[in-house]
Regions:
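Conserved N-terminal glycine-rich FAD pyrophosphate-binding loop of Rossmann-like flavoproteins
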Residues: 28-61, 65, 229-232
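Glycine- and aromatic-enriched mobile tails/lids
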Residues: 16, 29-31, 39-45, 86, ...
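N-terminal Rossmann-like FAD-binding beta1-loop-alpha1 element of flavoenzymes
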Residues: 1-24
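Short hydrophobic core segments
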Residues: 2-4, 171-181
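Short beta-strand to alpha-helix junction loop
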Residues: 68-81, 114-132, 190-198, 223-227, ...
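Core beta-strand elements of the Rossmann-like FAD/NAD(P) dinucleotide-binding domain
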Residues: 167-175, 335-336
């Protein structure tokens, strides 16, 4: 069994598969370049005294703009409270309040249900605990290499072609799990690692797996507006603690919608910027409490010369999360025998057209664990050998980023998506990143109306997220 990717989903899968032997294939050391480490906002779970799973389900369905799969929502959200207990047993140190867990409020949640660790370092704390457990598990091998192709025969997956430097290595496996994260690196500005360019989707496409909902890309409304491609995230939790959107004059402009769903807020921020205004988060009412509550964000701001206790924080939308992906069932199985997917690369049906804040770590952990259990339960097949083969072309996101940002961003139109698709088609034969971008643009063109994170100029608004 091979797991491609070393974030929360991949590590949970490896631990769930134990004591069956599994290899984690990762381009670098565990934790390096993983979006999971960068996740600030927290993990949503209905564990509060005033909360219940039905409320969390309702919030998720509302944010998903009518395109969630209710069964998937009920299953994944329903597993949240038990997941919290599992993570505590694995050594994750969530923040506490008195005798219980500290629970925060974020956009479009009806109750405080967001678990944090070290204020705004939830993903990093989860990864710390999971990496320690993985390294202490003898059945898990970590191999630093880059997956370049899923090898598929008549009866399903047969292995992975990987690159170590310029050398091609064929690794036999009848079960392969993709946990490669998202596609933010296909845009000029992203909250993801710049290296997150949809590698898992490219591998799945090449293998012939079914993909869906590729047009639904969430843009986080509050990335720190500083030079560079990978922009630091200013978590939703900052607004949950009372920060407000203001323009360059200090005037509020969100009309009480500071905690609306992300697609709604991102479009409002984008429109304000397009109109020539500045957009800032004003958290000055928190004063010195800001650095205590959000130490990582305070440090990020300090490096940019900003003191949130006395200055508004400049923000802009940036590509953040991909709701679409490889189509999977409840066990993470794709349409290819032996190929699984979990985490952001997978399309589970949980998010619909727009992800609810802090549901991603929840999904990654629950679905990663489910996929690991399913892989371990699948009967092994006879391994096979291969003739020597060369590496396929490496993906190059550089020529893709300007087109994706211009035409597949917060607001789209048919002419722009058509132009992007034409340009991508010219590059697709020799550039897997362009081949993936082409499918995203075609999915956007096919969805003629606006829904959730897919906002098409002139398109009818089919469903307004609550």
């Amino acid at each position: 069994m091979i797991i491609i990717g070393g974030g929360v989903a991949g590590l949970m899968a490896a631990l769930a598969a134990a004591p069956r032997r599994v290899t984690i294939l990762n381009p670098g050391p565990l934790g390096a370049g993983a979006a999971s480490v960068m996740s600030q906002g927290g993990l949503a779970a209905a564990v509060g005294a005033t909360d219940d799973v039905a409320l969390h389900v309702a919030d998720t369905l509302a944010a998903g703009a009518g395109l969630c799969e209710p069964e998937a929502v009920a299953r994944i959200i329903g597993a949240g409270p038990a997941l919290v207990e599992t993570l505590l047993r694995l050594g994750v140190r969530f923040d506490r309040h008195g005798d219980g867990l500290a629970l925060g409020l974020e956009a479009a949640h009806a109750r405080p249900r967001i678990l944090h660790a070290n204020g705004d370092q939830t993903g990093a704390e989860m990864m710390r605990a999971l990496i320690a457990k993985v390294r202490a598990t003898p059945s898990i091998t970590i191999f630093e290499a880059t997956a370049r192709k899923i090898l598929v025969g008549d009866n399903g997956v047969t292995g992975v072609l990987a690159a170590v430097g310029d050398e091609a290595i064929a690794l036999p496996a009848d079960r392969v799990l993709l946990t490669t994260g998202g596609i933010g690196g296909l845009f000029l500005h992203t909250t993801n690692p710049e290296s997150a360019i949809g590698q898992g989707l490219m591998l799945a496409m090449d293998a012939g797996a079914a993909l869906a909902d590729l047009e639904f890309i969430q843009f986080h409304p509050t990335a720190l507006d500083v030079p560079g491609a990978s922009l630091p995230l200013i978590s939703e939790a900052v607004r949950g603690e009372g920060a407000r959107f203001v323009d360059e004059t200090g005037a509020y402009f969100m009309a009480g919608g500071d905690l609306a769903p992300r697609d709604v807020v991102a479009r409002a921020v984008f429109a304000h910027l397009q109109a020539g205004h500045g957009v800032f988060l004003d958290a000055r009412e928190m004063g010195v409490r800001f650095a205590a509550r959000f130490p990582a964000i305070a440090a990020i701001c300090a490096r940019a010369g900003i003191d949130p206790a006395t200055q508004p924080i400049p923000v802009r939308p940036a590509a953040h999360y991909h709701m679409g992906g490889v189509v999977v069932d409840a066990a993470g199985r794709t349409s290819i025998e032996g190929l699984y997917a979990a985490g952001e690369v997978a399309r589970t049906g949980l998010h619909g057209a727009n992800r609810l804040a802090s549901n991603s770590l929840l999904e990654a952990a629950i679905c990663g664990e489910a996929a690991g259990l399913a892989m371990a339960a699948q009967g092994a097949k006879q391994s096979r050998g291969w003739q020597a083969m060369g590496l396929p072309p490496a993906p190059d996101a550089a020529p893709v980023r300007p087109l994706m940002s211009a035409h597949m961003g917060v607001l789209r139109d048919g002419a722009g998506m058509g132009l992007a698709a034409q340009k991508f088609s010219e590059m697709a034969g020799q550039n897997p990143a362009a081949a993936l971008a082409l499918q995203i643009a075609l999915a956007g063109l096919a969805r003629r109306d606006s829904v959730g994170a897919h906002a098409r100029a002139g398109g009818k608004q089919l469903y307004k997220a609550a």
